[in-house]
Amino acid sequence: MFNNKLFQKFCRDRNVKESTQHGYESALKNYTQYHQETLTTLIDEALAEENQAIPLKNRKLKKRLLNYRNYLLKSKSSPNTVRTYFSKVKTFYRHFEIEIPKLPDVKYNKLYETNYLDLPTKKHIRQALEIVGVDLRAIILFMSSSGTAKAETLSLTVDQFITGTQDYHDGGNIETVLNTLEHKRNVVPTFYLKRIKTDKYYYTFCSPEASREIVKYLKTRPGVKMTDPLFDFSASTLLARFQEINDGMGWGFKGNYRFFRSHTLRKFHASNIGLSAEYIDELQGRSKNMIHETYIKTNPQKLKSIYKSAMKNVMIHEENIPEVHHQEFSITINIFLSGKEYNIF
């Protein structure tokens, strides 16, 4: 598909990111395979019908789109996948200035909506950690305590971890830094990363127990470099490893998806950390409105303090939860009633 000149032009004209290209490629491959035609043939056919001034309702394009949508609806694909694939096909046609005929509305099957009780608990995550190696322990603890999505997690580099922990070491080569961090139990790294879906930069943090497991994991990778991925997984490999955990534990499905997967760790974080929606959105990289993005900048130290006050809620091993020291305040309130002053302590 990437060798098709029309597809290459489409991606180049729209400056489509590689991750988004894969989504279009999947949808368009599915569409061309269903019709057993090439992209070039399908576009040429639609252009020829326009040049011949065939009424929209009588064009092959309308029949092709309706038949393809019916095929998707009868498949085992989720409603979201059906909508996404069909939308991408129409976008491709429109890019080449082909008018889309009016299509009748269709009712999509209601997708099962997960609720709080469908999410993994700390017990589930502990059970998963007991059956995997240090590589998966590191990534599971990172994702569940930071709420970072899979794409951003796999985009992190060793350098970002070393830089993010600079308050806890005095620098040096990777081995020296890891040896220093290995003996600390309070490391909460600060990560500044980009949300791949939206290009938004944001700050997030992970727990001390995640940091310790990351250090252990990095020490098992001799010759690791600053430019190397922090977590050495491809997206497909990570997906397969989560499937192995879920199926091995017999946890089954919730709706169309397996119970234990990377995205449910993100939901675990959002649903359990106990902060307001505003702070959860900050930590997970969800966008504010454009005015806020332009004028209001996040203070990472303040956000880190807020995160640390709540991170116990997403830490998995109780013995690793640090003590939270509360400050006591003495407040005097002056009240005036009927001309008299009362002090309440």
Q: Residues of each region from the PLM?
A:
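Non-catalytic DNA-binding core/recognition domains of DNA-processing enzymes
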Residues: 14-97, 206, 274
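C-terminal catalytic core of Y-nucleophile DNA break-rejoin enzymes
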Residues: 195-216, 225-246, 262
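Catalytic-site neighborhood detector that most strongly recognizes the C-terminal catalytic loop/helix
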Residues: 284-324
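Conserved tyrosine-mediated DNA breakage-rejoining catalytic core shared by Y-recombinases
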Residues: 156-213
